[in-house]
Amino acid sequence: MVPINTTTGTPQHTRVAGALGAKDSSVRLQAALAVGSNPDPGLLETLVERCAVEPDFFVRDMLSWALARLSPEITLPRIRQELDSEHAQARGQALHTLSKIGDRRAWDWITRDLLRDTDDEVARTAWRVAVALVPEDEKKNLVDDLVAQLGRGGRDVRLSLSRALVDLGSVIEPALEKAAANLDPTVAAHARATELLLRYPEAGFDVAIDEAKRVVTLGPERAAAAATAAVAARVAGSPETAATMESTGSTGSTEAAEIADC
């Protein structure tokens, strides 16, 4: 555990720091709640330091909430420093805290290095924050950075990336169309699944990726038509049409599933 510096704080600050570092996670959670309920700028450093080492998800989330309750004028500069930390949790939690604060001044801090962070959890958080803060005239550049990572990671990572892209809206369509023709079948399937989610968000990621994998070996034109028709049929609740589309794509389904497995 990273030690917390309490030498310059008041006795109350020392007690709070002790509670935030207690062995019992419920004690730490209550302490973070108390700090957030009574914002104290003197505890800024303690909260930031705890974010970097706190093992419990719910406590970390409460710590970020407590930081968001402080004035952004003092909080943002300190959080910005954490984005360059060598510790992945510190970077990720700093990004999460920025999402809670929601101050668009932080957009410039969401660098390409963060969007492509080697730690999946950091990258996923960076995608979410970037989509929330991006100015309108920067959306295309953000789309390019996100689309470049299609096919990355397992199901949860790919779902996060698809959600981030879909949240940007129709601006993603040209880049996805290009990525859907990628020679890497994993990238192509992920791009097609994201296209389908944009058109039919109610279909869900698993349905979209299943259809994308099913038709990825049929060729660009037939694949796009088959995937769109199959998902549309499922959304419309037409089992006959869906069955027809499943039959159409059956010849390539096994190979597609192997090469585009999520």
Predicted regions, residues:
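Amphipathic alpha-helical scaffolding segments comprising HEAT/armadillo-like alpha-solenoid repeats
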Residues: 2-19, 38-52, 72-84, 103-116, ...
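Short inter-helical turns and helix N-cap capping residues of alpha-solenoid HEAT/ARM repeat scaffolds
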Residues: 23-24, 55-56, 86-88, 118-119, ...
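Alpha-solenoid repeat junctions
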Residues: 35, 39, 67, 71, ...
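Eukaryotic acidic, Ser/Thr-rich intrinsically disordered low-complexity regions
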Residues: 177-235, 258-262
